[in-house]
Swiss-Prot record:
Protein task: Probable rhomboid-type serine protease that catalyzes intramembrane proteolysis.
Origin organism lineage: Eukaryota, Fungi, Dikarya, Ascomycota, Saccharomycotina
Keyword Isomerase included in the entry's annotation: no
Name under which the protein is recorded: Rhomboid-type serine protease 2
Subunit structure and binding partners: Interacts with SNX3.
Originating species: Saccharomyces cerevisiae (strain ATCC 204508 / S288c)
Active site: S124 (nucleophile), H179
Highest taxon listed in the record's lineage: Eukaryota
Residue numbers on the Cytoplasmic membrane side: 1-16, 79-89, 134-151, 192-262
Length: 262
């Protein structure tokens, strides 16, 4: 893996919200040793029915162990950086809040029937939302993805599902349903992003907020980029996340040999 391209996706500096989120998740983890944050903010199926909104929106911030935190930080870094770069910093914050809320509601609804006592916490739901979102976008360009540069491939759209099952097998204590519903939200947003945009603040409101906070935005350290909404075109064509290799052709135009997929 090219670690430089992972740390600096697209060769661009780290995005402001993504960087701030990593720092904040680490701070929350450390504070959880002093305050009962895990007990207060972990999401339980009953949280929805008791209208515990703090749990419904903040459960991704809580991590139960250092490996839990590290894995999620590493997993979310590149896709969230790219999302922020193409959608704007404030919009990305709205995206994270709404996706956590939607996944949390689904988790609680099914959990009331199947796992009434099971708690869920951590940013892995966000990770799976981003994985599903980008796998859907990527599948429109590259329908199949090679497995570790072998001659074998799987449908790009289903790659997050493979990861979901693999994690459930390798780490039995992980929250399968929390990951699954994060995945569902990501697929839904990727499929109908125009619908999702209708429930987010209009661009002119975000721009107005940013102008009122311009003094604070200018305090962001050098080397970290804040993406202003007025500079973002969310209608531009999707750009591949990690790879720039040529997609496999879907048909034979009689100009050469069609590449096969295993």
């Amino acid at each position: 893996m090219n670690w430089k391209s992972y740390v600096f996706p697209g060769g661009h500096p780290p995005a402001a919200l993504t960087t701030g989120l990593v720092v904040f998740l680490t701070a929350i983890y450390l504070l959880s040793f002093i305050f009962a944050l895990r007990e207060d903010l972990s999401l339980a199926p009953e949280s929805l029915f008791k209208l515990q909104m703090s749990r419904l929106s903040l459960y991704p911030l809580i991590h139960l162990s250092l490996p839990h935190l590290l894995f999620n930080v590493l997993a979310i870094w590149a896709p969230l950086n790219l999302f922020e770069e193409t959608h704007g910093t404030v919009y990305t914050g709205v995206f994270l809040n709404l996706s956590a809320l939607f996944a949390g509601i689904l988790y609680c609804l099914l959990g009331k029937l199947l796992y009434p006592e099971a708690l869920v916490a951590g940013a892995s739901g966000w990770c799976f939302t981003l994985f599903a979102y980008y796998s859907f976008k990527e599948s429109q360009i590259r329908p199949r993805t090679r497995i570790f540069r072998t001659d074998y491939s799987i449908p790009t759209l289903y790659t997050p599902l493979v990861l979901l099952v693999a994690i459930a097998v390798v780490i039995p204590g992980s929250s399968f349903w929390g990951h699954f519903f994060g995945l569902c939200v990501g697929y839904a947003i990727g499929y109908k992003e125009s619908w999702f945009n209708k429930i987010t603040p209009p661009g002119w409101i975000i721009t107005k907020i940013e102008k009122s906070l311009d003094g604070l935005i200018r305090l962001i350290p050098w080397g970290i980029k804040y993406y202003r909404d007025e500079d973002i075109d969310r209608t531009k064509d999707y750009e591949p996340l990690m790879s720039t290799e040529t997609p496999l052709p879907l048909h034979n135009d009689n100009s050469g040999t069609v590449l096969g997929t295993a």
